[in-house]
Curated annotation (Swiss-Prot):
NCBIfam families, A to Z: rsmG_gidB (TIGR00138)
InterPro entries: rRNA_ssu_MeTfrase_G, SAM-dependent_MTases_sf
Pfam families according to UniProt: GidB (PF02527)
Main location: cytoplasm
Protein name, entry field: Ribosomal RNA small subunit methyltransferase G
E.C. designation(s): 2.1.1.-
Database matches in Gene3D superfamilies: Vaccinia Virus protein VP39
Organism this protein belongs to: Bacteroides fragilis (strain ATCC 25285 / DSM 2151 / CCUG 4856 / JCM 11019 / LMG 10263 / NCTC 9343 / Onslow / VPI 2553 / EN-2)
Gene for this chain: rsmG
Binding locations of S-adenosyl-L-methionine: 71, 76, 122-123, 135
Source superkingdom: Bacteria
Cell location: Cytoplasm
Protein family: Belongs to the methyltransferase superfamily. RNA methyltransferase RsmG family.
Keywords, in A-Z order: Cytoplasm, Methyltransferase, rRNA processing, S-adenosyl-L-methionine, Transferase
GO cellular component terms, semicolon-separated: cytosol
């Protein structure tokens, strides 16, 4: 939790309680259903929660916005973002039912009211949203092809509607076909920890 407060000092008391509760909840659920590698669970706040919140370094979702988290796994980046933006609606989708169950149980346990869940493949989701977020789900070209149908034409945020991905490593080749619509933000500009040296937020206007 100290790590989160280092970078997000203005969290409300409710948000602090919700973030603080995540550790024990994920420890418990991860012992039953593996959604985070066993060796990485100790790094929950750095590698998963803070990483998810990297998206907030490029956008502050406005009240009433809608966001789909595609391939949410155990709830990342959707659950941390839903805590940070309580007036934004988040829809978390994953093709693996047991992972959706973990995310649902965690969200219910901390009292999140602005999240919905669906066990489905990306191709099956027909609703539209202001943004789609994801964390290293698949190559950019494949992801854009799948989610183009899910981006609403109605604009209400400072950034035009589109796709926001958390990715790592060398991405120039992957982003090349979309270079005129893509911007990359290096998270090592915001977060000091070694983990973020190669981590990026990739934004693509759709």
């Amino acid at each position: 939790m100290k790590l989160l407060l280092k970078y997000f000092p203005d969290l409300t008391e409710e948000q602090r309680k919700q973030f603080a509760a995540l550790y024990e909840l994920y420890i418990d659920w991860n012992s039953k259903i593996n959604v985070i590698s066993r060796k990485d669970i100790e790094n929950l706040y750095e590698h998963h929660v803070l990483h998810s919140l990297g998206i907030a370094r490029i956008i502050r979702f406005r009240a009433g916005s809608s966001v789909m988290d595609l391939g949410t796994g155990g709830g990342f980046p959707g659950i941390p973002l839903a805590i940070l933006f309580p007036d934004t609606k988040f829809h978390l989708v994953d093709s693996i039912g047991k992972k959706v169950r973990v995310a649902t149980e965690v969200a219910n346990a901390i009292g999140l009211k602005n999240v919905t869940f669906r066990h489905a493949r990306a191709e099956e989701e027909k609703q539209t949203f202001d943004f789609v977020v994801s964390r290293a789900v698949m190559p950019l070209a494949d992801l854009i092809k799948i989610i183009r149908k899910n981006i609403s034409p109605k604009q209400q945020n400072a950034l035009p509607n589109g796709l926001i991905c958390l990715k790592g490593g060398e991405l120039e080749h992957e982003a090349m076909p979309f270079k005129h619509k893509t911007s990359m933000h290096n998270l090592n500009e915001d977060f000091d920890e070694e983990f973020f040296q190669t981590k990026k937020v990739v934004y693509v206007t759709i």
